[in-house]
Amino acid sequence: MEPTAPDLQLVPEVTKAVSVSAPDPGPCRTAVIAVVGISMAIVTLGVLSAFFSAQGAHVEHIAELHGIRFTSSLQQENSDFYRLLTHALQTLLHFLLRALQPLSLKQEADILQKGIQARLQEQGLSLAAYGTIVSVELTGRCEGPVTERDLKSGHCPGNVFSCQNGQCVSKENPECDDRVDCSDESDEAQCDCGWQPAWRSAGRIVGGVEAAPGEFPWQVSLRENHEHFCGATIIGARWLVSAAHCFNEFQDPAQWAAQAGSVHLSGSEASAVRTRVLRIAKHPAYDADTADFDVAVLELARPLPFGRYVQPACLPAATHVFPPGKKCLISGWGYLKEDFLVKPEVLQKATVELLDQSLCSSLYGHSLTDRMVCAGYLDGKVDSCQGDSGGPLVCEEPSGRFFLAGIVSWGIGCAEARRPGVYTRVTRLRDWILEVTSAADMPVVPTATPAPATPSTPWPTSPESWAPNTFAKPTAAPSPVPLHPSTTAKPQECGARPAMDKPTRIVGGISAVSGEVPWQASLKEGPRHFCGATVVGDRWLLSAAHCFNHTKVEQVQAHLGTVSLLGVGGSPVKLGLRRVALHPRYNPGILDFDVALLELAQPLVFNKYIQPVCLPLAIHKFPVGRKCMISGWGNMQEGNATKPDILQKASVGIIEQKMCGALYNFSLTDRMLCAGFLEGRVDSCQGDSGGPLACEETPGVFYLAGIVSWGIGCAQAKKPGVYARITRLKDWILKAMSSDPSSMARPHTSSTRLIPSEPPKTTAAGLIIPEATTSRLATPRATIRVTTRPLNTTLSARSTTTRGQTAAPSAPGTTIHSHLPDCGLAPPGALTRIVGGSAASLGEWPWQVSLWLRRREHRCGAVLVAERWLLSAAHCFDIYGDPMQWAAFLGTPFLSSTEGQLERVARIYRHPFYNIYTLDYDVALLELAGPVRRSRLVRPICLPGPARPPDGARCVITGWGSLREGGSMARQLQKAAVRVLSEQTCRRFYPVQISSRMLCAGFPQGGVDSCSGDAGGPLACREPSGQWVLTGVTSWGYGCGRPHFPGVYTRVAAVLGWIGQNIQE
């Protein structure tokens, strides 16, 4: 095995500032780095070469130079300095000194200085012109030649941030985080950019959702001969970045134009801007076979007019860290599915997760390089696709600014399982990008000779023409050398979203709009608002325990669905409280365990104005500096008892626990959390107590980090607000939700409760939330390749019809039979040996229907309930709502069979109360164009009576969905037996998401479940008479077959009235 050299630093004695560990003799020798030139270096190289040729040693390392003041001209990879220095270092890094005596520091410095000087003097270059080398260090062994790695220059090693004055800052991502880390304040000097937008929600590009105007102001559509061909990102008034492979075929800038400021490809908005592309610079090391260095810089013919809808994204520092697991955003006008059938007119957006590099590399046969980064999900479903190439992968940092982490590059298919998207890693190529944009007189790297004037093909005919060969061996090419930020790209303006409202303060703050904080509740005793509360379920609110020190519960009412204390606007709801549970360890003296769980007298109906916030996991981390939102109707300034009529909102930062304790001269407990600003100005105040501190963890999804508890004054300097920390209290919250009422009810009228020494507080905060906030665990069981998370989707033009506004079910005494007299009859023995799933036989489940999209592929299941009526899941039609796109295939368990009946769908009726976010009322009726031909293979199932099925009832689920989580779909109908779980058990597994229209079925240990592609299919239970009744419709679940996460089904008995009304009409 080849020995590895320890780290070595060569420092001249006169500037010795770093301790140097002397190398030990023996097998593990210190490697001496020297850059040797013509004169004195030739002798040194000769000696070393002769010695090492005999030893046969070989080692490769990353080298870092310290102390040279590199200018932009040195960053050109075709410059003499860069080329000679790189070659010289590479030459000597292949030697490992194993037998020589250690050199003195002066000898090491002399060899280094004279070697480089001689090498450069040969070419007429002077080292003195560029500074004095302070040190060179080996940062560890690496695979591949040094020219394929990062040869970094500057004062600071590794991923340490370098201030403009040379100070090194070891803090991760210090730039633009609203905290000064450099003594010259250079880390915060150009950061007036990228504030939090007023509205945003997550979705998908493949099967995705539309972006709002101004939501992605850095997004550009690149037009080749007037057709959208690729995406690009604005980084300066005259500069865009895109993918180099976009210009493999069309290389003449005259063929290209850029459209910005519009979410519509037609550019119909007044804000749309079009300009010509003046020149295209592809990275000189770009490899079309491996897609390595897949980046291009485009100069525009005229500068873009920055405004509300046109803004640049922030370029990250070379040391910027985007950790695996971070949620980021992709956007583009690429195809909505892999087979090129759908191209959106409106810009699509999606949330993806950054993946571990080693993991992603293993998925792609280890063909990834350091210039690539992966994002997506291992189970597929969300991805960029053809036409999105060159577009942005942007990540929001705690400061609220958006940084360009990647450029859409390549992938296998679109949204396929275990085939995430691959993006060009911007941090590795940032310095080359800035080199191009800052060198105004630098000749652009040729993209190729101009193409002849032949007719172009605007759209590729196959995915392969978009995806470079991903398995070719990458070629070695030197990485760019880091460069100090250039001002040409106007970083002070980057990342902004001025079309969106910006957050402000609660004390002296701004008003929220209807639906902006849909989880906010006002607790009133008579007409008086006294505390806030937060919706965490359809029957549950959270508030502060101290709110009930002197409060009579029976006199309290919760007001929701409106931002007005007077109940004006929105969808106001007023409900009494059934019971209140204070934490058993609540301490009114120090306000420890300051949390209360409130059960409403009746369940809420979620809509766009009333939504629950997500509860975080107990292990969830809300890092210091994270900007979160507070909201409430509390006092707008300290000492002023006047409360606002309109809900107030503000943004506050999470504060380090020990620092907060020091500010209060009080040891905060683990159940407390501080948020605000050390200089004050923004805070919650009296009347905000019990309200939410909500943090947006993924775009559009807010988690409850804290409950407004206490503080000294309101918005005073060095006295931030203190909140009850939800992660430390969640176990009790969940236990209280699922416990018996008698075990949690406590009297709250005792006069022995003490008022806190400092008045309780309330809050108001800013950062708009889209309406999709909860049900993050809910994975709708619909399509396998396109849309599988409709709870976060919206639809621009739906053709589905809503009928029957009567939601109350009828109350038949027994099973409701369909119009055909022999409903629910199946061959005997249908339940034998099916636990764990097995293939169904012909005629075994004659009511099972496969819904085909465009008569091309199975998308969802359905159930025959009458001669011309099917029942399915409403979320199956979130994206594709036009009944003309759907067909019903029934009468066979084989998807490839030619024997079944194929019927056209005439109309689709989704339940009028269907909630796209929570999947409540997730049911739809499909009317066929004509009645089905009844036979032993085609027969309707019976509808159930109003009663719930008995707990533990053994029922059957069927479908063609995935055979395992993330796997492929079945070609033959599958069946499995599951147990119906009690409502209490179901709520224990899903404490927030379960409504009275849902039921759970499965096994606590997992193993048997419905999965993607089964949505809309039946949960059928057999009655003693032998008839089968439709108990549930497959809706959603967390994963497939996971322990403690059973499948969730729409309870058919809860929507019988609506079904009967439509079928009768």
UniProtKB/Swiss-Prot annotation:
Residue ranges annotated as Cytoplasmic topological domain: 3-31
Any one Gene Ontology cellular component term annotated for this protein: plasma membrane
GO MF term list: serine-type endopeptidase activity; serine-type peptidase activity
Domain LDL-receptor class A: 155-192
Active site: H245 (charge relay system), D294 (charge relay system), S389 (charge relay system), H546 (charge relay system), D594 (charge relay system), S689 (charge relay system)
Membrane-crossing segments per the record: 32-52
The Peptidase S1 domain, residue ranges: 205-438, 506-738, 834-1064
PTM: Proteolytically cleaved to generate 3 independent serine protease chains. The cleaved chains may remain attached to the membrane thanks to disulfide bonds. It is unclear whether cleavage always takes place.
Gene3D superfamilies per UniProt: Low-density Lipoprotein Receptor (4.10.400.10), Trypsin-like serine proteases (2.40.10.10)
Keyword Cell membrane: yes
Residues of the signal peptide: none
Protein name in the entry: Transmembrane protease serine 9
Organism the protein comes from: Mus musculus (Mouse)
Gene that encodes it: Tmprss9
